[in-house]
Amino acid sequence: MTTTDTAPQSQPFQAEVAELLNLMVHSVYSETDIFLRELISNASDALDKLRYESIAKPELMADGGEPKIRILPKKEPDTLSVIDNGLGMDRQELIDNLGTIAKSGTKSFLTKLTEAKDGAGLIGQFGVGFYAAFMVADRIVVTSRRARSAEAWTWSSSGGAGFEIAPASEEDAARVTRGTEIVLHLKKDAAKYLEPYEIERVVGAYSDNIQFPIELVPEEGEPRQINSASALWQRSKSELTAEDYSQAYKQIAGAFDEPAMTLHYRAEGRYSYAVLLFAPSTKPFDLFEPARKGRVKLYVRRVFITDEADLLPSYLRFIRGVIDSEDLPLNLSREMLQNNPQLAQIRKAVTGKVIGELESLGDKDPEAFGKIWDAFGLVIKEGIWEDYERRDKLLALSRFTTTKGENRTLKQYVEDLKENQTEIYYLVGDSIERLKSNPKLESAAARGIEVLLLTDPVDAFWTSAPLDFGGKPLKSLSQGDVDFGQIPTTEENKDEQAKPETDEALTIAAIKDALGDKVSDVRASQRLTASASCLVAGGLGPDRALERMLAQQNRGAASKPILEVNLRHPIVAAVAKANAADAADLSLLLLEQAQILDGELPEDPAAFSARLNRLVLRAL
């Protein structure tokens, strides 16, 4: 090619790339096969992009032949080449795509990759698989020509602090007429990847369902296709095995685990489309990154369009797979994707199918569903807050730890309601252990009432919506009034129903006088049987747990709580009989004890300590 400056230009890697390359160059990961899977996946993406852009610009397909991927092993020197005749890259795209990682969550990814015993799965999840090639190569040379461009460029690196980029030599430019050629100079311990049978093994395991032909070009003999090159989702379920689905999942999702759920069907009628979706069995590292998109790919008549179409609601963002429409136009713009009524109908129908399949799995295979719930239950519960239309189904799908055990459903809860019980009770907190010892459970426990123990951060939000299940409203034990009067205590707790001997009005008045505006109210508790006091929120505001969470995020100050006291408790009974100073100390102690039990610090820890010491010394 002709150029005025053919000298290579050296450029440094972005800091995150340099750190990632250092991990790859000195990799101890056992799954080195990932490098070939990732390079083939990138080549397939480039062919997809070419096919998509050629819809509007057919001339892009004029040079370079039919779309395919070629793998060339050469033992003299020890090089392995992966070549595609896809869209290709220009100089700036080579720099941007191979010299930087323009993704949110990069630091989190690198931290997890450093800590992982085997990071191969993380590499695929984050979409930086090109760099995995440095696990097997000590030098990589990439030559690329964008479709219909007069110029080809060569990028090269030995995995150090930077890379070189230069116009391609005449020989390289003549060889790469469209697309990208990646040449790996293999390390000595990676020589096995030069063997045709080893290449076929890796392609068969990870890339068999790539839609484009993958050709193995041996040093001796004729090139031959080594993958099936079929859109698996277009085939009948009866033709496919569990192994077929496993391979398709790993190829589509860039994963190493097995799918916990597979949903494959074809919709016919007003709109026709094929669906192949998977629920992973392990949680991806970036599940809660704010910028994380869904991972479902949209195809139109087997042409890849985008993976940014929000084909499922955000609370199903862990689902991976493909939706292939027969009816959508191929030239969909991003704006059209957002406003296309046909796509909205597909989204609604597929979302319903996914939730239905999860329900069915929960009934038929609790163990498989348990893997999904353990990994993604926290995300699914976001939908209870976000998706009013499907709220009841998501509540039915949810599994809870309760005072009766783990993995309980609301259906089971309602079936086990106590005599005269009309509400579903729950308590939100930081940990199961702390919730189990929370004094607000005492009166419920005395009656054998089951209580949901909620510890995920999202629980404080979805429970703030007005909810019911099976006609039974959900009720927080940390908010508003609780009346267990119509529900009898168990035989061993009969004494809990005995009336207190303490003068309620006098005691409440004394505590209110001592606490002043530190609380919004003081009242006798229906929640407590053994503890002296607890704090609750008013009936109309948010739950105490949500108030604390919002306050910690500077999204509003927590309102003043209500102090509930157990009139049967000796400390509470002592307030009305004590002198003014002791009554004040006892009242403040009741408040501060309740704060500690709620996971809060007393307003003045030093004063709390001094007050406690005074009361103890007086009792000696």
Curated annotation (Swiss-Prot):
One GO cellular component, as annotated: cytoplasm
Ranges where the record places region A: 1-334
Region (B) residue spans: 335-548
Alphabetized Gene3D superfamilies for the sequence: 3.30.230.80, 3.40.50.11260, Heat shock protein 90, C-terminal domain (1.20.120.790), Histidine kinase-like ATPase, C-terminal domain (3.30.565.10)
Region: C, residue numbers: 549-620
Sorted UniProt keywords: ATP-binding, Chaperone, Cytoplasm, Nucleotide-binding, Stress response
Compartment(s) where it occurs, according to its Swiss-Prot or TrEMBL record: Cytoplasm
Matches recorded under InterPro entries: HATPase_C_sf, HSP90_C, Hsp90_fam, Hsp90_N, Ribosomal_Su5_D2-typ_SF
Keyword ATP-binding among record annotations: yes
CDD domains, alphabetized: HATPase_Hsp90-like (cd16927)
Gene Ontology MF annotations: ATP binding; ATP hydrolysis activity; ATP-dependent protein folding chaperone; unfolded protein binding
Superkingdom to which the source organism belongs: Bacteria
Pfam families: HATPase_c_3, HSP90
PANTHER family: HEAT SHOCK PROTEIN 90 FAMILY MEMBER
HAMAP family, sorted: HSP90
Subunit structure, interactors included: Homodimer.
Similarity-based family: Belongs to the heat shock protein 90 family.
Role summary: Molecular chaperone. Has ATPase activity.
Name used for this protein in its record: Chaperone protein HtpG
Gene name for this UniProt entry: htpG
